[in-house]
Amino acid sequence: MTNAQRADSAGMPLDVNVLIGPYPYRYVPHPDPDVLVRVLAREGLRGAWVGHLPSAFYRDPTPGNAALFAALEPHRAVLAPAPCIRPDWPRWERALRDAVEQGAVAIRAYPPQWGMGPHDRSLQALAAAIGEIRSILLLTVRFEDLRQRGNLDVAGDLDAATIRATVRSAPNTRVVVTAAGREMIEQVHWGLTPDERARLWWDISWIWGPPDDHLAHLFRTLGAERFVYGTQWPMRLTQTPRANLDLLPDDLRDARLADAGEIELR
């Protein structure tokens, strides 16, 4: 059995970080749910939490959420919606309830795109509300490397201070952070209490494997159980996380990621 298969007790991981829809700053090929279903089958993944890529850049994400639910309806056995809720927008509380009633598996938020910093009260209110309804807050550090971004994309990366403050502000909320690298993960992890760390997971879509071996280092220092499987398709290659797991050193051959399905049930 490979390390990639050990990522999940069933041998088929669940991808917490995929997106559908166009990207506003460059062409992204085939970001469609029917293509995604075939990609998941090819990669041996049992399903995915799916966000709507353009909604991150809408002032009002409501139409994007409607488009997400409609697009995923034929594929709900495999694709679970993860809509975004903007907490400084009118009637966001109702939008959150509606999303959960429609089967949202997690709620995405995009603080950099919405101009929200570490002490933004609306972001903290959203985090607390997500905890109250027993859902999961999903944050995204970045969509592209800074060196790739177009001049119109002026939002920076999600910073460590905002992640820490958000986790601290909502003691009943589970948080999954996607697209973070080793430095960001360490800045956040070592700045939290053990109880706070226990409610926080990281996907592995942006963590380097060999020769830097950042993934192996993080498994040894934080524990593999703090990480979940994520690819950030279609922005990144779906094969990269699996390859990085397969290339883990021998001393980590029994390392096992947290299962996103189990996080849902906590």
Residues covered by each model-derived region:
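Mid-to-C-terminal alpha-helical segments outside catalytic/metal-binding sites
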Residues: M1-V18, Y25, H30-G47, R97, ...
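Active-site neighborhood of phospho(di)ester-bond hydrolases with catalytic His/Asp-centered motifs
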Residues: P13-V16, W49-H52, A82-C84, R108, ...
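Conserved, mostly hydrophobic/aromatic
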Residues: N17, L40, L68, L72, ...
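Acidic-and-aromatic substrate-binding clefts and catalytic sites of carbohydrate-active enzymes
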Residues: P24-P31, S55-P63, I85-E93, W114-R121, ...
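Catalytic pocket-lining loop regions of alpha/beta-barrel enzymes
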Residues: A106, H119-V228
